């Protein structure tokens, strides 16, 4: 919670990645990536509820067995669609979309984005960075077009 606003974190996770199949279950120092990402959300000062959104029973069971709420969703073209499906039924003021393949995210970054968004009455925030040489042609790099 931040300034009396209830904040949910939805973590989309799917097994059928074409570039890295079963990515959410890949172990990092003995713990599955999806659990590491959920741990990051749990360490945020402002996240009130964490939900892993997945179409897969293996991920759902893993999360539930490790004290994380997981909801089975339909099949979606993007993770954003998966988050939107889950968000429709949440009783909260804000939804933080934390991608299930971002195990290097720091809880402080989440808190800073939440604080900035609420303090400045911003409807949508997206983290990004400037591209490095050659990345524009790399299909593994998600691109953001920003007009300043």
Language-model features: locations:
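Short, high-confidence coil segments that cap the C-terminus of an alpha-helix
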Residues: 47, 92, 119-123
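Short phosphate-binding loop-to-helix
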Residues: 57-115
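Short beta-strand segments
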Residues: 12, 97-99, 127-128
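Conserved donor-nucleotide/metal-binding helix-loop-beta segment in metal-dependent transferases, i.e.
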Residues: 107-135
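Conserved small/polar residues in nucleotide/adenosyl-binding loops
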Residues: 146-148
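N-terminal glycine-rich phosphate-binding loop and ensuing alpha1 helix
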Residues: 3-54
């Amino acid at each position: 919670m931040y300034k009396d606003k209830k904040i949910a974190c939805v973590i989309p996770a799917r097994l059928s990645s074409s570039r890295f199949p079963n990515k959410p279950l890949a172990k990092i120092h003995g713990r599955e990536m999806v659990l590491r990402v959920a741990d990051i959300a749990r360490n945020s000062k402002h996240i009130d509820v964490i939900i892993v959104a997945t179409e897969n029973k293996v991920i759902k069971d893993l999360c539930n067995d490790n004290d994380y709420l997981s909801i089975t969703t339909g099949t979606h073209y993007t993770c954003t669609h998966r988050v939107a499906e889950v968000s429709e039924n949440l009783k909260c003021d804000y939804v933080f979309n934390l991608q299930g393949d971002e195990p290097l995210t720091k809880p402080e970054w989440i808190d800073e984005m939440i604080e900035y968004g609420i303090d400045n009455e911003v409807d949508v925030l997206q983290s990004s960075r400037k591209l490095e040489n050659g990345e524009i042609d790399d299909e593994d790099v998600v691109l953001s077009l920003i007009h300043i």
